[in-house]
Amino acid sequence: MSGARRPGTSKRKRNWHIEHPSFREERSQQLRRGNFKTVEAADSLSKAWLKCGEGFQDTSEILSLASEKTGITEKHLELSPKPKTETTSKNASELPNIIWSSSESDFSDEDKTLPALQRDGRHGPRADRLGDRTISCPEDEDIEDELQVIDWEVNSDKEDPGGPSECEDDKGTLDISDCDSCASLTSDDRLCEPSEPISTEILEYSSDSEKEEDPEHSLFIDSESPHKYQADFKSDARWCLVSQTDSEANSAEPTLTPQKYTVKFPKTPEYSVTKKKLLRGGLAERLQELQNRKRSAISLWRHRCVSYQMTPLGRKSGVLTVKILELHEECSMQVAVCEQLAGPPITSPPGGLAPRPGAYLKVLFTRETADHLMGHPQDIIYIFPPWQKLLIPNGSCSIILNTYFCQKAIAKETVREDLYSPDISLSRRNITLAQTFRIKDITDNSSINQTTYDSLATPGTGWTHGHEKAEQHLIVAAPLRNSLLDIVESQRAGLWSGVRVQVVVQRVYSLLSRDGARSQQGHTVGHADASGAWSCLLVQDACGMFGEVFLNSTLWKSRQLEGKSCSMSGVKVLQKATRGRTPGLFSLIDSLWPPVISLTEPSCGQPSGETKTYLPPPIFCYIFSAHPTLGQIDAIEDHISKLYQPPVVRCLKEILQTNECSTRCSFYARVIYQKPQLKNLLAQKEIWLLVTDITLQTQDERDHSLPKTLPVYIAPSCVLGPEVVEELALLVSYNLLFRDAFKDNGQIVCIERTVILPQKPLLCVPSASCDLPSPVTLDELSALTPVNSICSVQGTVVDVDESTAFSWPVCDRCGNGRLEQKPEDGGTFSCGDCSQLVLSPLQERHLHVFLDCPTRPESTVKVKLLESSISLLLMSAASEDGSYEVESVLGKEMGPLLCFVQSITTQQSSCVVTLEEIELLSTEGATAAQPPP
């Protein structure tokens, strides 16, 4: 085709103010004058794509292309601009111009002069053809003069309209090649070629980075042009496109240096399947690299802010200092209305409006930046470059974008905590596009589009131009949601969610405060009770999701909420719990699964249908913390919810006969012995309770599969109420209700989230039908007797442990064993506790004997005897001088003795069973353990 352009058929759109974005680190190398018709275009497109996310800076016709070695595979593109025949419409010319300016241009260096075009008058006509506005984008002050002008040759620039051109409006081709060696070429090595009207087909290319040569990875670009080029991404071949500096040459031609012959393989779907590594497009990979580099840059900058105190270096630094006046949230972005305190001056808004004394800005923060800043009204924020300013014609104020690098300063003035509490959540505004663009055709006046979800129901203000005009938004109570996930989605880091969710309280219990939970809740969450425990609720929503809520109220008030449907608001997420992290919590959740009624699907305030499909047990849940003043958990209904599952109380016989492992169980039982004895209410340690009920005591004596008594281990993580601790301090038998105890491998353990309550006597049940036999029957010592259990022992004394046999005097009044003997008083003893002389002290003795038990003939049974048994054993074995001979006690029968199994040690040839003789708790004043109704 001829290079001549038909008048009136093809025109450029010059009124769209097309601005070419430039990328960082693509700086000019030299300043070229107007007599240069061509310029070197050998920069790497991959470099531009890799750097495109560091901030867009607007330019008009100035496009810097730096010749830097990229060290990656070559990318060859043939661009064919299509003819532009349409003219600029009237509506297009009437569109408002949005002026973009960067913090590194007129904001950061406002005193810099526009280079190149403004200093060289010969470029004026060209600037008029490409656009009517120029914006300078200097990167640094030290390279502000190293700018390069690229002249894009068009038909209107040619003196000879019939001659060839580099780029034609009708049909043209611009070949751009990415290479490593084009920067080292001289002007003599640069060749040009007249462009021909061709169409381009761009195939996918390999993104592999292997350095080995493989002809199978060659890329073939086919087009209608007689010039067909081949690029080998696995070889050292380099294609480069250069522009000839000679004025007689007006075209460009690709040059191959050095020449290498490869085999061409067209890309087909069958070919891609046979490859071990699929050839992928590089755009997605480069976008991922760009996002990773962006996140890395932000993380590194925040780390520097924490390590070093970064302060603005004055006006030249381009740091914008603002003061937050009002905050709200729109479309997951935090919008801050700020007052500019320092930094580059704000230009006058378009429309000829006079600037006001004190510039007001709207600063947009992303969710990650807002979580890092945790800004509040009256806070001072430093916004470091590169930030961008957006001026909207007829707009209220300027908008600051690209605020990734921000730092909060400590405000000098004292802010009242009652007005700007850090625990107050931001107002949430749902703004539709119809309201933004004032579309009258859409007549959706529903309250959902005009609702501000604010947990405090405080009025929000929409800023227009400073403080003069404030638009009041409609504030209504937050709708009642049905999913706990709404709290998670609406919560901001460090803030409290104002979403109201309807939940059912399944369990109420206490948990010991941990250091991790205390640090996450902070010092303002409240305080635990005297024992250092927190009141907790296990709640479940209508969708089946569980959550654990830390409260600040007393436990007895929280127990009134169990089983009721409640409204929960003013909470925040402490952590996400999984089965691996909190197995105790999920063992309790598994006991409540599956639900007794059909669940509903999550919905945002709209009707939701029930789902009856089978749902697996949940694999995660959330742990919440209620605000000390704003947190509210109120009962909606007085009656018990249908979703509530009360603990199923069963008898001990039924629990032991089930083969379920790692499950929760609830039962009534009477405590007949405890070890150790608690003498004060604060001494909580590992406790073993020996319990029984009527079902174990009345079973057939010939059935030895079930024990008569059962040991229950109370772990230190199990919180005991004050009423239970008082029961443990008494030396009487008592009845307890064990809720949600953990059964594992036939052993019952009270762990965290297990509730132990004193049992109240049931008046409706006759006591005679449930009374335990007196005395309580125990199992005999056998090979099946476990450790930490009680049993009955009977046998013959075969030996005495003389190393542990001794006696000492004690006070006959108080039993104090630390008596003082005074020689001046004739060797009498005195008690320090009673402050009196002990005339007839009692003798306490300590003795271990070895028994030969017929129930365990192959084992050595060692028993620590009580004082009563020692006195009975030594009654007839005393000599005239008061000493005892070992031979006098051997062969005597002992028993039956009630003993606690301390340990069972298995050696190579024998087994040693260590027992301790005990006394069961008194049954005076105790009622029988009631079976479940």
UniProtKB/Swiss-Prot annotation:
Biased segments, Acidic residues type: 138-148
UniProt feature, compositional bias: Basic and acidic residues: 16-29, 71-87, 119-132, 214-224
Region feature Necessary for interaction with RAD51, mapped onto this chain: 175-469
Key word DNA damage present: yes
Entry keyword set: DNA damage, DNA recombination, DNA repair, Nucleus
Disulfide bonds: none
GO CC, alphabetical: nuclear chromosome; nucleoplasm
Compartments, record wording: Nucleus
Keyword DNA repair: yes
One Pfam family this sequence matches: DUF4502
Protein's GO biological process: cellular response to camptothecin; cellular response to hydroxyurea; cellular response to ionizing radiation; DNA damage response; double-strand break repair via homologous recombination; positive regulation of double-strand break repair; positive regulation of protein-containing complex assembly; regulation of double-strand break repair via homologous recombination
InterPro entries for the chain: DNA_repair-scaffolding, DUF4502, DUF4503
Region (Disordered): 1-34, 67-174, 205-224
Subunit structure: Found in a complex, at least composed of BLM, RAD51 and SPIDR; the complex formation is mediated by SPIDR. Interacts (via C-terminal region) with BLM; the interaction is direct. Interacts with RAD51; the interaction is direct. Interacts (via the C-terminal region) with FIGNL1 (via N-terminal one-half region); the interaction is direct.
Function: Plays a role in DNA double-strand break (DBS) repair via homologous recombination (HR). Serves as a scaffolding protein that helps to promote the recruitment of DNA-processing enzymes like the helicase BLM and recombinase RAD51 to site of DNA damage, and hence contributes to maintain genomic integrity.
Name by which UniProt lists this protein: DNA repair-scaffolding protein
Organism: Mus musculus (Mouse)
Gene name in the database record: Spidr
